[in-house]
Design a protein with these regions (language model features):
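Alpha-helical scaffold repeats of the Armadillo/HEAT/TPR superfamily
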Residues: 9, 57, 120, 166-172
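Generic hydrophobic, aliphatic-rich segments that mediate packing or membrane embedding
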Residues: 7-10, 27-30, 57
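Structured C-terminal portions of repeat-based eukaryotic scaffold domains
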Residues: 172-178
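Alpha-helical repeat scaffolds
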Residues: 3-18, 51-54, 169
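An alpha-helical repeat/solenoid feature that recognizes helix-turn-helix modules
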Residues: 1-2, 20-52, 67-118, 129-165, ...
């Protein structure tokens, strides 16, 4: 019972809809994840309309969707706090778009959410790199972001061969394989500068698949 874990009630904070205010900068995605994870019967037993609660956070998440279809975590806040006559120009971020769409996935039966997800997927397709991977910031392939895209596709029941996410014959799974290093596992970033005779100074890499840590 999430309402009684070691004497703590983890449901109460989720009902604080003031955190979904237009000028708030909370992690709205996490609220949607948590709301969806609680059995509807639990909400009813607490006299809370889970759907209405989720709708308020959905509205706030959708406010962060930029004109290019992507998501920027501060776009909604910037629009809400802009001075009269001020134009806010937002640009989608790949990691933030994937995160937002993942949070919205459980609510895609709602028409407005489904439309937002489609726009977000169109954005992600447009910024996918030539080898099928995705970047974090800039144009450098990133293993962690590419893996999160694979997870999103699974949540949305999108085939790995969906033509929107195949670039030059490379699927997202093909791209993920390029981040595998023998003896290490999967790494996030190949952008490492170090003398070849001093590999001990290379940073520790996180294996996003196995949860292991190692160095080259």
């Amino acid at each position: 019972d999430p309402g009684d874990i070691n004497g703590l009630d983890y449901i109460v904070p989720l009902t604080n809809t003031s955190k979904a205010a237009p000028t708030s900068t909370q992690d709205f995605n996490s609220y949607l994840y948590d709301i969806a994870s609680i059995d509807p019967e639990v909400w009813r037993s607490r006299g809370v309309d889970g759907d209405m609660l989720a709708e308020q956070f959905i509205t706030r998440v959708l406010a962060d969707q930029t004109l290019d279809g992507g998501f920027d975590g501060y776009y909604g806040y910037s629009v809400a706090t802009a001075k009269e006559g001020e134009t806010v120009i937002g640009q989608g971020s790949v990691p933030e778009t994937i995160s937002a769409l993942s949070a919205l996935a459980s609510y895609r039966d709602k028409e407005n959410v489904a439309a937002a997800i489609e726009a977000g997927l169109t954005y992600l397709s447009s910024v996918q790199l030539a080898d099928g991977s995705f970047e974090c910031w800039g144009d450098t392939p990133n293993g962690a972001v590419t893996l999160s895209m694979l997870s999103l596709m699974d949540k949305l029941d999108i085939s790995i061969d969906d033509e929107r996410f195949v670039k030059n014959g490379n699927t997202v799974a093909d791209a993920m394989r390029t981040f595998y290093v023998d003896g290490v596992g999967f790494i996030s970033d190949f952008e490492v500068e170090a003398p070849l005779d001093d590999l001990s100074r290379l940073p520790v890499y996180e294996n996003p698949v196995m949860g292991n840590y190692s160095t080259i």
